[in-house]
Regions:
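Hydrophobic helical segment of the DHp/HisKA dimerization and phosphotransfer domain
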Residues: 46, 53, 65-68
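Short helix/strand-capping connector loops at secondary-structure junctions
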Residues: 61-73
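Long, amphipathic alpha-helical coiled-coil segments characteristic
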Residues: 2-48, 74-97
């Protein structure tokens, strides 16, 4: 996670950063079940996660999602892992604040 990216984007406003990260975490909890193997509509969810992740500086997550869009459902475990890593990084970042 590139939190510097988000900090620059939010002009250092800690309130905005906190709100954005909290919203991402809440959305991640809704996205996760939609990434189960065999889930219908997974491609749309992956596309949404790609944009949301890149928007907060989760470049690796965005790249994994782009790869899954191109390759297919077999990469959903990789997407789930990258999403979990992004959420863990957010938790650690927010714990420091």
């Amino acid at each position: 996670m590139d939190f510097d990216y988000l900090e620059r984007f939010a002009a250092g406003d800690r309130t905005v950063i906190g709100e954005v990260l909290t919203l991402f975490r809440e959305q991640a909890a809704l996205w996760a079940p939609k990434l189960a193997d065999g889930a219908t509509g997974w491609r749309e969810v992956v596309h949404t996660i790609k944009g949301a992740g890149r928007g907060i500086g989760a470049t690796v997550l965005g790249d994994v999602c782009a790869e899954a869009e191109a390759v297919g459902e077999s990469l959903l475990p990789k997407v789930r892992a990258a999403l979990a890593e992004a959420v863990a990084a957010i938790d650690a970042y927010q714990a420091r604040e």
